[in-house]
């Protein structure tokens, strides 16, 4: 399941583009997530009142949270699979407080890949997409394992 050094390089190259505007990318990812899987919006009390894409785009809180999400993910990706210290508190909060299912992590992974394809197509060809898919799958699998440690089947 692990990624090769070359695959990690592809992941981190495109992630460097994301880091140029974490809040903007994060906002787009969350909007994509909420549009394609509206049930995920119910997990965010702060955003439940946002009914249209225009309302979502105008929300400073949504943009801020998007930046928070992608900052945390970036910190995990940069560890190239050696992310135990970064993953544990994230898994604990998502399992015990937020109750975010692994299925929802799959949905946000799809949204991330979609946003990267649309914003960075030159740096996100088939090889980079496959590598990012593997990196996000590794993240989800490790989150699922941690969830079980916290007694959440997610």
From Swiss-Prot:
Phosphoserine sites (modified residues): 4
InterPro entries for the chain: Globin (IPR000971), Globin-like_sf (IPR009050), Myoglobin (IPR002335)
Residues that hold heme b according to the record: 94
PROSITE patterns linked to this entry: GLOBIN
Record GO cellular component, one term: sarcoplasm
Cell compartments where the protein resides: Cytoplasm, Sarcoplasm
Domain Globin: start-end pairs: 2-148
Binding site for nitrite: 65
Classification via Pfam families: Globin (PF00042)
Phosphothreonine modified-residue sites: 68
UniProt keyword annotations, A-Z: Cytoplasm, Heme, Iron, Metal-binding, Muscle protein, Oxidoreductase, Oxygen transport, Phosphoprotein, Transport
EC number in record: 1.7.-.-, 1.11.1.-
Catalytically driven reaction(s): Fe(III)-heme b-[protein] + nitric oxide + H2O = Fe(II)-heme b-[protein] + nitrite + 2 H(+); H2O2 + AH2 = A + 2 H2O
Main subcellular location of this protein, as a coarse class: cytoplasm
Family per record: Belongs to the globin family.
Described purpose of this protein according to its UniProt entry: Monomeric heme protein which primary function is to store oxygen and facilitate its diffusion within muscle tissues. Reversibly binds oxygen through a pentacoordinated heme iron and enables its timely and efficient release as needed during periods of heightened demand. Depending on the oxidative conditions of tissues and cells, and in addition to its ability to bind oxygen, it also has a nitrite reductase activity whereby it regulates the production of bioactive nitric oxide.
PANTHER family assigned: MYOGLOBIN
Subunit and interaction comment: Monomeric.
Name this polypeptide is given: Myoglobin
Lineage: Eukaryota, Metazoa, Chordata, Craniata, Vertebrata
């Amino acid at each position: 399941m692990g990624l090769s050094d070359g695959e990690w390089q592809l992941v981190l190259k495109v992630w460097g583009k994301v880091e140029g505007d974490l809040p903007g990318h994060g906002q787009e990812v969350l909007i994509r997530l909420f549009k394609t899987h509206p049930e995920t919006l119910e997990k965010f009390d702060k955003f439940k009142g946002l009914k249209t894409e225009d309302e979502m785009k105008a929300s400073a809180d949504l943009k801020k949270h998007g930046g928070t999400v992608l900052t945390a993910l970036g910190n995990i990706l940069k560890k190239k699979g050696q992310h135990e210290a970064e993953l544990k508190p994230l898994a604990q909060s998502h399992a015990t407080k937020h109750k975010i299912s692994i299925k929802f992590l799959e949905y946000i992974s799809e949204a991330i890949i979609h946003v990267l394809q649309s914003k960075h197509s030159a740096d996100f060809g088939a090889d980079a997409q496959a590598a990012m898919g593997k990196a996000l799958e590794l993240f989800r699998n490790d989150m699922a394992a941690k969830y079980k440690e916290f007694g959440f089947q997610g």
